[in-house]
Amino acid sequence: MSQEITQKDNNDHLVQSSDPDHPANMIPDLCRKFYNWGWVTGTGGGTSIRRGDHIFIAPSGVQKELMQPHNIFVLEFPTPKYPPSDRKYIRKPLDLKPSACTPLFLAAFERGAGCCIHTHSQWAVLVTLLVEREKGPGGYFEISNIEQIKGIPRGKGKGMMGFHDTLRIPIIENTAFEEDLTGSLEKAMEENPDTYAVLVKRHGIYVWGDDVAKAKTQCESLDYLFQLAVEMHKLGLPWVK
């Protein structure tokens, strides 16, 4: 059943805090950083944080560099992914729409993530195009013998990757509507249980981590590796030794 929320009972206190580490403050701060890095231009992309049984999600259609705490949606967790009308919003900005990324974020949280980031990084898009050209559909982005690989986990409780390891990131096909990516994202998660990221062809990437710091630093490390891979390709250098 759809849950009607009025201004009177909108639980605004859930997004009001002087603590800079509160999710309602962290999400706008992260979105501004990501905008300045070119990851979330034109209102694209999104960020979500889970704290206990609450999920804080950036809205749809708000310029990322202008986002404020009062723009943030709050969901109970766990909550159904589908249909959208069954999602348990306990705080909704009345003039905004929930992020179309919501069911994909929920898929990450169901795996135990504490934060999920979606970017439209140009480097992420470019590597999906290069993999498509070189390997065809179903290919993975793979790279080895690069120091920054050490910033990526091997898997839950398995420590971090090493210099000589080969990083493999699955790539899924894009869809006309963001929410329709959910099934293929979940399939990629199931087939690659140690991955913390999934690339979306001609679109961007989803990255998640145990907490905000881990999700952010993993996203930074991956973007560095994607940019490096594009430059290596220009020079005719292989990604995997």
UniProtKB/Swiss-Prot annotation:
Subcellular location: Cytoplasm
Organism: Aspergillus terreus (strain NIH 2624 / FGSC A1156)
Top-level class of the enzyme under EC nomenclature: lyase
Lineage top rank: taxon: Eukaryota
Co-factor binding comment: Binds 1 zinc ion per subunit.
EC numbers on record: 4.2.1.109
Positions of substrate binding: C101
GO MF: methylthioribulose 1-phosphate dehydratase activity; zinc ion binding
UniProt record, GO biological process: L-methionine salvage from methylthioadenosine
Enzymatic reactions: 5-(methylsulfanyl)-D-ribulose 1-phosphate = 5-methylsulfanyl-2,3-dioxopentyl phosphate + H2O
Pfam families: Aldolase_II (PF00596)
Pathway: Amino-acid biosynthesis; L-methionine biosynthesis via salvage pathway; L-methionine from S-methyl-5-thio-alpha-D-ribose 1-phosphate: step 2/6
Keywords assigned by UniProt, alphabetized: Amino-acid biosynthesis, Cytoplasm, Lyase, Metal-binding, Methionine biosynthesis, Zinc
Region Disordered: start-end pairs: 1-22
Feature: compositional bias, Basic and acidic residues: 1-12
The protein, known as: Methylthioribulose-1-phosphate dehydratase
Binding site for Zn(2+): H118, H120, H203
Chief site of localization: cytoplasm
